[in-house]
Amino acid sequence: MHSDATLHILTQFKTYQQTTEYTCGAASSLMVLNWFGQAQYHENAVATLLETHCTKGSSVENIADLFDLIGWNVEYHASEHPKFQTVEEAEQAIIRYIDRGIPIMVDWVDWAGHWQVLIGIDTCGTDNPYDDVLIFADPYDVTDHKQDGYYTFPLGRFFGMWREGPCAEKENPYRQPFVVAHPK
């Protein structure tokens, strides 16, 4: 699959399946490391560096800190307030990152809190972002009878569900948590 006028995608993004129920953040980080050619890392080591907790998983801050520690450019959002006020703003930001070859790690309410890597968006040739389809590298791809690590979801629905899940155990969970990291 390659980008075209409506499809923006990281071609040949390799997926990875997490080995525990709680290391989706580590597995997502590992996929981003691998995307940029950093294949020396392993899921368990990354989980340790992220201080991954067996019920809470990995935090936005710890994932951002890991990439900062290895000297990468890092942008992240960890706030009770949304970064993007409209679905259109989110759509344009996603397109900008993907078109630059940069995946976006997102944490959302799927599975009561789950990290995935956003690797593509199809605008379906319309100006309406509510018909856009997001393409994820999902480290816990167990729902479509084809465990290839790829998952699609409508942007409009995702935008409304883009917040930390109950497993974060916060009274005021982050809204639109994400980490973008790439080598300097």
PLM features per residue range, with description:
Residues L49, L66, A93, Y97, ...:
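Residues that form generic nucleotide/phosphate-binding pockets
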Residues I70, Y76-S79, V106-Q116, V142-T152:
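Short flexible/disordered coil segments
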Residues M1-H2, T52-C54, I121-K184:
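Noncatalytic regulatory segments and standalone regulatory/sensor domains
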